Curated annotation (Swiss-Prot):
One Pfam family per UniProt: H2O2_YaaD
InterPro entries per record: YaaA (IPR005583)
Name listed for the protein in its UniProt record: UPF0246 protein CPR_2119
GO cellular component term, pick one: cytosol
Biological processes per GO annotation: response to hydroperoxide
Gene source species: Clostridium perfringens (strain SM101 / Type A)
UniProt-listed NCBIfam families: PRK02101.1-3 (NF002542)
The organism's place on the tree of life at top rank: Bacteria
Homology family: Belongs to the UPF0246 family.
Length: 254
């Protein structure tokens, strides 16, 4: 069983006091191809492409120019660097070494630049969303560039797991990069809803955080069987069998 998360736009590269070796992303060669294309762009090209302000464009341009493929094994792990809502829910800063090692086996972070990241892959500062409309070496976009590579890597990783199931906690933008995987293995998609009057509705900021909270639940409880996720009860959520349908599992909170 492997869970999926989307990356966050914000990175914190402050190094923690952590004695654990980080790894080089498996698709570093593909990332280098993408970055070599991005290095040819000027700030005035990046801003409309990535839909960012000029200030962010300057920062992004610098990150792109400074990016390289040199790894020393002491970089900050990506799982501790990302700072979006999902990662606030994951709250991996208090993970033990054993927690991080389990998480490294049971979580993959989808990425426009790196394809699929392990939590303990070493961080290099970057900004590139999967939906960015950029052509890389003749490809139509990043989905076209990645093709089936990300999906195939996940299927290979699943070979080492007893239960061949994907827990899809990624956004649609990122899941789209592996959308054919449900024809190969079972994909369970948890959905998190809040009570609004007489109905339950998805509240984006809470839903994003809950995705990370579920990964935390998986990690802290060493969960390897998908059925055990129905016991997820952090922060007031509970499995709602009535609203769930097939492999879309709904968790509600009053």
């Amino acid at each position: 069983m492997i869970a999926l998360l989307s990356p966050a736009k914000t990175l914190d590269l402050t190094k923690p006091n952590l004695d654990i070796e980080t790894s080089k992303p498996i698709f570093i060669s593909e990332a280098e191809v993408i970055m070599n294309n991005l290095k040819e762009l000027e700030i005035q090209d990046l801003c409309p492409l990535m839909k960012i302000s000029e200030d962010l464009g300057v920062q992004t341009f610098t990150k792109i120019q400074d990016w390289n493929t040199i790894y020393y094994g002491d970089e900050k792990p990506f799982v501790l660097s990302f700072k979006g809502e999902a990662y606030r829910g994951l709250d991996a800063d208090d993970f033990t070494k054993e927690d991080l090692e389990f998480c490294n086996d049971s979580l993959r972070i989808l990425s426009g630049l790196y394809g699929a990241l392990k939590p303990l892959d070493g961080t290099k500062a970057y900004r590139l969303e999967m939906g960015t409309k950029i052509s890389i070496d003749g490809s139509k976009n990043l989905y076209d560039f990645w093709g089936n590579k990300i999906m195939d890597s996940l299927l290979k990783d699943l070979e080492n797991h007893k239960e061949k199931v994907i827990i899809n906690l990624a956004s649609n933008e990122y899941y789209k990069s592996i959308k054919q995987i449900d024809k190969k293995v079972r994909v369970i998609t948890p959905v998190f809803k809040e009570r609004k009057g007489i109905e339950y509705k998805v509240v984006t900021v809470y839903a994003k955080k809950a995705r990370g909270q579920m990964v935390r639940y998986i990690t802290k409880n060493r969960i390897t069987k998908s059925e055990d996720l129905k016991n997820f009860d952090l922060y007031g959520y509970e499995f709602n069998e009535r609203l769930s349908e097939g492999d879309t599992w709904v968790f509600t909170r009053d």
